[in-house]
């Protein structure tokens, strides 16, 4: 996930503050936030299929199924980031590889580079048009990351200190930087997580960065003041004992006097039915960004690996990979109180 800054403005302008988004009038204290039901995200418009991957040449290296230099007509995507660049264009980056037919083994084979799609110059509402976002050259293939493992998953991008920082997994969590979103320089490893660490996402709040990520059946968070040195992890949420699957693609948002944790459910039973891209995402609320344990969801929202971001007018949007359409789709959302 990523926010939508004006070009290279300080990141503190993007922080989800209490006054920025038309919240409750006056100051909402922590106790009041607990007593009130917080607003929940509601999709209020159509899903528009803004990006469908075009046919492309597989850049390699060879995998069991895909061969370097061969052209494949159909590609699929997964976890992704959306951001507005200094060129006035909206960009999307994410997992990609040639499509795997339903029922074939290893539907995530060769996730070794990222797609890059870009819309024409103009505000997001003008780019909410089917097919408007077009493929650009793939980025960060293994040949450009020779000191890393081949896999590159779930990019998340924020502007910081005059650069765009991209975080990606799976473990070790690594990062790359860019000044323009077109040319990227891999910078290496940030940390490793015993077991697993994937799907990183970063929230900035009160001078502290919070990185949430998936590890097995839990969501973990680490904190940092400079994006380089990270604390030890805190487990902020876990699936109930006995549940199968996982809490994937987590996102933390600071809004409405507290914090939202949103994650996409991977249901192992659905996987047995060959449903690879599942689109049930769950919304949790807490006054403590490090504790969503033993809480019930306050809402469910459609979207696979959903990203939540704002446009130039401060309006909110959600994106989804592969559901309801191949590629990336976006829809407007509103934060509303439950009736």
Predicted feature residues:
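Intrinsically disordered, low-complexity serine/threonine-rich segments
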Residues: 1, 29-30
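Bacterial N-terminal signal peptides that target proteins for export
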Residues: 2-16
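Short stretches within intrinsically disordered, low-complexity N-terminal or propeptide regions
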Residues: 6, 22, 32-33
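Bacterial N-terminal signal peptides
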Residues: 14-26
